[in-house]
């Protein structure tokens, strides 16, 4: 009788251990799925913000809200993907700066007496930029992190921004603010 009780106890222990292991495995899968769903939502929100810039005329209505939504969606995606996507923050910031540059270009070139064809022609840089940004976002979302591609895209957006500023005789965009410093060990805390 003691042997039977011992065997049943051992079997119960094995079943309980196996059940716990399976429950933990399923919980990890569910957590990973939830993380993927949250990241997918951020990708979609950014794509929506980009799509709202295609066909948009900043000479007809303010561009501020659309650029703010774009910046917020970019920030959320960078924060959600974290350190696994090194370089994404730099690329998205350079793209945002390029979008602001094209928005300014469109607004400065617009005239109240523009024909439809002229207006559409002046919108091309902003629309084309938004279309290409959307394509690059879809590519990266489907392929996954690609450090060399992100570096190349960052360099391209930065050089395009500087080129437009130079062509228009504008000052280059600021890349930093001397009044803002990152918090680190050398920064005095109060």
Q: How would you label these PLM feature ranges?
A:
Residues 1-68:
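Membrane-proximal alpha-helical anchors
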Residues 64-190:
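An amphipathic alpha-helical interaction surface
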């Amino acid at each position: 009788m003691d042997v039977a009780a011992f065997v049943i106890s051992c079997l119960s222990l094995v079943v309980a251990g196996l059940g716990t292991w399976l429950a933990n495995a399923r919980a990890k899968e569910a957590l990973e799925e939830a993380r993927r769903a949250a990241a997918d939502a951020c990708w979609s929100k950014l794509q929506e913000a980009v799509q709202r810039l295609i066909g948009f005329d900043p000479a007809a209505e303010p561009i501020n809200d659309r650029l703010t939504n774009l910046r917020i969606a970019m920030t959320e995606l960078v924060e959600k993907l974290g350190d696994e996507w090194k370089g994404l923050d730099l690329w998205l910031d350079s793209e945002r700066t390029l979008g602001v540059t094209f928005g300014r270009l469109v607004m400065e070139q617009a005239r109240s007496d523009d024909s439809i064809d002229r207006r559409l022609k002046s919108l091309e840089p902003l629309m084309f930029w938004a279309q290409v940004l959307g394509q690059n976002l879809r590519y990266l979302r489907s392929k996954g992190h690609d450090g060399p591609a992100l570096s190349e895209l960052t360099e391209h957006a930065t050089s395009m921004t500087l080129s437009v500023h130079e062509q228009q005789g504008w000052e280059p965009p600021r890349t930093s603010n001397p009044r803002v410093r990152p918090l680190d060990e050398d920064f005095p805390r109060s």
